[in-house]
Amino acid sequence: MTDSATNDGSTTTTTVPIPEGWSRGISRTLNRPYYFHRESKHTQWHFPTPTEANDPIGTKRRMHHEQSQRHKKSSSSTTTTTSSSNTTPATSNLNSIAIIVPYRDLHPTQNRAKHLQAFIPHMKSFLSKLVSSNQIQDYHIYIIEQSDDQRKFNRGKLLNIGFDFALKRSEKHPPRHTIFIFHDVDLLPQDDLGKWYATFPTQPIHIARVWDRYSNNSKYFGGIVSFSEGDMKRINGYPNTFWGWGGEDDEMQKRLETVKIQWDGPTEGTIVDLENMDLSTKLGFLKQNKEWKCMVKWEALEEHDTTWNRNGLSDLSYDILKMSRLDKEDDGVSKATMLTVDVKLNGNHWANDKCGVHYLPQN
């Protein structure tokens, strides 16, 4: 039994089988899937990680302990908690984080090279604190750069490539990543969000919910989002067919809703926006540069029902053109890697004809 689509990646074919001894059910009360280990009688909401699959009894004990600790903290608090978003998330020093950043420095006015120069040292410092405080085991930063291919920026496909590469790399060079955080290069989290990075996402975590620009938009699901491997594969990742700014996050929300995955996020925390634009300014900036926008957004969203399970990780194709380190080695180990990739066209998809970097629809 499997729990997702087949993934025909750039080099290998993988599936998402439910681990031996585990079963999947649907909660009638909450109308969402859960996972059950028959022998230990352990139940959890999220797809089992490799560690959980191999040691369900230990997982059951650990989760019981974490729940007891949270209950003690809640009982001793004078503030009543009404939402999981207001609680301190549970962290584990078994977790390894992959920070996956889509990137291209094509338009000087976007200042992406300047943003990257600030992003790498900040994130290394931020994540190293989580390691030294024993909240996570390890991390690696992956900058996925789209080559100068004369096509519009394809954020969704770059994130899929980053996920695919990071997973394969960590399988060969343990520890295996358990947390995948899809991250914009111009957003710098501050220490008050550290635990939201370190916690295993039993359901997706929209960390950028607290970003000032979109904090009043409940439909926004971009900026910084944390996923487990299992949930990312269940929804077949991001769409590959959104060329230009906008739309891929909306499609991601549709995928979560289709497979009945709920998401969470902090209600407070600090993010420094290197662009330093409010929503009105950003929209005005894009209006002045219409060719950057996705000109197929609405048509691509309309085909969600018929294409979501075959447009994403399942048909991902790309070539790695260059791989380089972006940092000085820490104890002989680099913590930041840039991949320059050829994202390739998507089979015979109709949007291939509308992905040129200067494409605008005819009036």
What residue spans do the PLM features occupy?
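Short, well-formed alpha-helical segments that are part of the catalytic scaffolds
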Residues: L106-L127
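A recurrent flexible, glycine/aromatic-enriched loop bordering the glycosyltransferase active site
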Residues: V210-F227, R234, W243-G244
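WW-domain-binding short linear motifs
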Residues: M1-P33, R38-S85
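Short beta-strand-to-loop acidic/aromatic patch adjacent to the donor-nucleotide binding site
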Residues: K172-Q190
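Active-site-proximal specificity loops/subdomain of glycosyltransferases
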Residues: V131-H177
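Hydrophobic targeting segments
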Residues: N95-V101, M123, H140-Y142, G162
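C-terminal catalytic/acceptor-binding lobe
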Residues: F119, G244, D250-N363
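Conserved donor-nucleotide/metal-binding helix-loop-beta segment in metal-dependent transferases, i.e.
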Residues: Q190-Y214
